[in-house]
């Protein structure tokens, strides 16, 4: 094992750092996976009743079924692979982690590129679209930076940029409970999905991105921004 790989493993070995990442990480992965599966079943199954609170949202995704599936199926695969990418037991095997990393990079590219047309004419209008495009750009930039560093063999910085991309991606999971709160309080606020989806996206992505940045800086890599 080369020196870079050894130092990368040591960097993630302390129990405190492990707890820092796994405590919020697993719930977000579960939420994201559940949301993706729910959307896949909704697209492949019968249409939602017109009285369903999510009927308008389901109809919007159904109108671009192929694009939506091309976006969320790779996203589901990405989410399911993430625990292995973070697991210390897997990271002890450089070949295995290299294969997983390459798969994540390919899946991430598909997710990021398909998110661009998905961001046009969303349910939440220009507010949602602007949040999606901004954070998708940040995701693609972080992913590309991580890929370049990976192929350069600069594994610690590669991991930093990959984790930055992952924090952006998991922002979509944070939006789900926020959207749930908006739906649950509709009888009080009288807000429609077209009015609150953009706000939910801004809140979800921003909170998760800031949390990810805080973790990276507390983690104390040689350089968080190189």
Residue ranges and their predicted role:
Residues 2-226:
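Alpha-helical membrane insertion/targeting regions
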